[in-house]
């Protein structure tokens, strides 16, 4: 084999390389939400191990999975500490404020603690 033929073979693409490129699936074109931008066939996007059945990897959970597993005693709280209802019981006994809401406006009274902050409000 001459040097000229060797150069031609090394620069020409091999058949196996072109076959691999044609078999590759299209990638996710848009780098946004993979659920909406992935161009791969969803049927091929499954995960399966020897210990689990195949599952779709694009949609892992839905509302029917909530409460699927019963709680086990190891995860129960060890003690019960109820919250004090002092504020709620006071509102229940005395009623709401004048306009039936809580006072959430900032307090605009003059600050007398520190003379430099006295006229900042």
From Swiss-Prot:
Q: Spans of biased composition, class Basic and acidic residues? A: 1-10
Q: Main localization of the protein? A: cytoplasm
Q: In which tissues is it expressed?
A: Expressed in airway epithelial cells.
Q: Does the keyword Transcription apply?
A: no
Region Disordered, annotated ranges: 1-29
Q: What domain of life does the UniProt record list for this protein's source?
A: Eukaryota
Pfam families linked to this entry: PIRC1_2
Which keywords label this protein? Cell projection, Cilium, Cytoplasm, Cytoskeleton, Flagellum
Localization terms from the record: Cytoplasm, Cytoskeleton, Cilium axoneme; Cytoplasm, Cytoskeleton, Flagellum axoneme
Q: Tell me which GO cellular component terms the UniProt record holds.
A: axonemal A tubule inner sheath; axonemal microtubule; sperm flagellum
Annotated signal sequence is: none
- What GO biological process terms does the UniProt entry carry, in alphabetical order? axoneme assembly; cilium movement; determination of left/right symmetry; flagellated sperm motility
Q: How does it assemble?
A: Microtubule inner protein component of sperm flagellar doublet microtubules. Interacts with CFAP53, ODAD1 and ODAD3; the interactions link the outer dynein arms docking complex (ODA-DC) to the internal microtubule inner proteins (MIP) in cilium axoneme.
Functionally, this protein is described as follows: Microtubule inner protein involved in the attachment of outer dynein arms (ODAs) to dynein-decorated doublet microtubules (DMTs) in cilia axoneme, which is required for motile cilia beating.
Which family is annotated? Belongs to the PIERCE2 family.
Q: What is the protein's given name?
A: Piercer of microtubule wall 2 protein
Q: Per the UniProt entry, what species is this protein from, by scientific name?
A: Homo sapiens (Human)
Designated gene of the protein: PIERCE2
């Amino acid at each position: 084999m001459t040097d000229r033929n060797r150069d031609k073979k090394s620069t020409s693409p091999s058949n196996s390389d072109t076959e691999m490129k044609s078999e590759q699936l299209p990638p996710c074109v848009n780098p946004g939400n993979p659920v909406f931008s992935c161009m791969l066939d969803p049927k091929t996007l499954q995960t399966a191990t020897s210990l689990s059945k195949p599952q779709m990897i694009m949609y892992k959970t839905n509302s029917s999975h909530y409460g699927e597993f019963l709680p086990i005693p190891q995860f129960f709280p060890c003690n019960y500490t109820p919250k004090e209802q002092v504020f709620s019981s006071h509102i229940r006994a005395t009623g709401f404020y004048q306009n039936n809401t809580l006072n959430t406006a900032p307090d605009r009274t003059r600050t007398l603690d520190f003379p430099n902050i006295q006229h900042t409000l």
